[in-house]
Amino acid sequence: MSVVEIPVIRWGKPYESLEKAEVVHFETGEVMARMHQANAGLVQMDARKATKAREALRQFSCTELIEKCRQAAELYLTAELPLGNGTQTPEQFCSIQSATTGLPLNMCRANMNKNAFVLKHMGDMLDALTRGLPLDILSRGYGMESRNVMVSFQATTPVLGLVLPSNSPGVHTLWLPAIPLQIGLVLKPGSSEPWTPYRMYEAFAAAGVPREAVCLYPGPHDVGNKVLETCNRSMIFGGQATVDKYHGNPKVQAHGPGFSKILLGDDLVDRWEDYLDVMVKSVIMNGGRGCINCSGIWASRHTAEIADAIAQRIGPIVPLPTTDPQAAIAAFTTAGVAEAASNQIDAGLKPGVVTDVTAKYRGGERLVKQERCDYLRPTVLHVTDCDNAMANTEYMFPFVSVVQCPQDKMLSKIGQTLIGTAITANEKWITELVDARNIDRLNVGPIPTCALNWLQPHEGNIIDFLFRNRAFQNSLPPAH
């Protein structure tokens, strides 16, 4: 079988580079593809044409582009689409994504369906995120609202830059709205997961979206840095250090760990068994890899029983072949990462304060080392001191700390929380939760942290990121 060669894409035109990087199978080391490599100079040179990307998209109305998104969703899910010097079926897409990322096939398919769902429902999503604003106002830059008020929105950038991760194909839903908003895309794919951006690009093109609105720059780290430097608005995905680095930079939206949590209120905690399925799903879904997975369950009592019940459910889970429909955990493909995380957890254990409850249900070690990859088996900690560092930590596998903490101290102790599910009917506490600025997405009721409604903003509203609301007048105001 010949190895697929995948070019750099410069405003829709393939570009072959002398520098190439191999993308290999995580278990066998077999070369799956050769990626032509961009460099920072190339990105800098192409940035001068960024305004043309928006011009190309503005040939079509937002409504027409939403329809093209719907068509692209179907093509992405079902069609054989071009990939470099070959083509790729949906089955081949899932297979190669699994082979290079270590993600089980069932999770690759689930992520594929999630991306397609967002594309299919793009009209509803944009209607919700714009609060019903007529989309032609975004295209034209100004217009009359239904209440007969002149409003103006100015695009903050002609293109959205993305520095994408290698280990989480689910994040691609966040940049898909750019195209129907007539904003071009400058994508730096993850080194082992270029498959989603390239397939999405081909699906958009097959649906009639102008190719010249998109750049794809596989390459080393300096390419990502240059994308962030040259684009007026960008997103980057990484760890806490990445989030800290770009904190306060209005040009960059940094997505990092979620520290998502379930908080059990005193009014309902005695019925914790009723919510066990919600807790388990929140921890284990998608291999526990996402910022939307639950990494902390907080309650004032019953925490030892809760931790034990979750540990019984997820502790026995073992690594399975990626093709097994029951596979529930993903491989760590970068040497040393899993071992370092496992050592860190062990170092955090403290008799009577931090206990690994899964140890007795695991029947083996947490760390499973294989020839070319490692696995971490699900881990549940019971933490009796809410100030201990292990009460608020997160790892890229099914890991959760069940923390004992009085309800009246929870909001001051949980720290930054991307998704907070509060299982309570206490109206006074619900008001406090609504007011808590350290919770981004708030769920009230037994809703898994990973059950996202895409009609809601995620880590900020992309409309507010890509457009600036400003004053506009083309006639004298009343009373002048």
Mark where each language-model region is.
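N-terminal Rossmann-like NAD(P)+-binding subdomain of aldehyde/semialdehyde dehydrogenases
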Residues: 1-146
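Short, flexible loop/turn motifs enriched in small residues
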Residues: 13-18, 155-156, 168-171, 373-375
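Short, glycine-/Ser/Thr-/acidic-enriched flexible segments
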Residues: 13-15, 39, 166-167, 191-192, ...
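Conserved C-terminal structural/oligomerization subdomain of aldehyde/semialdehyde dehydrogenase
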Residues: 25-35, 62-77, 189, 209-211, ...
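A non-catalytic, amphipathic alpha-helix used as a structural packing/dimerization or gating element
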Residues: 45, 49, 60-71, 199, ...
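Rossmann-like NAD(P) dinucleotide-binding subdomain of oxidoreductase/dehydrogenase enzymes
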Residues: 131-280, 457-459
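ALDH superfamily catalytic-core signature
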Residues: 203-206, 231-233, 239-385
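A generic structural motif
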Residues: 215-218, 255-256, 321-331, 425, ...
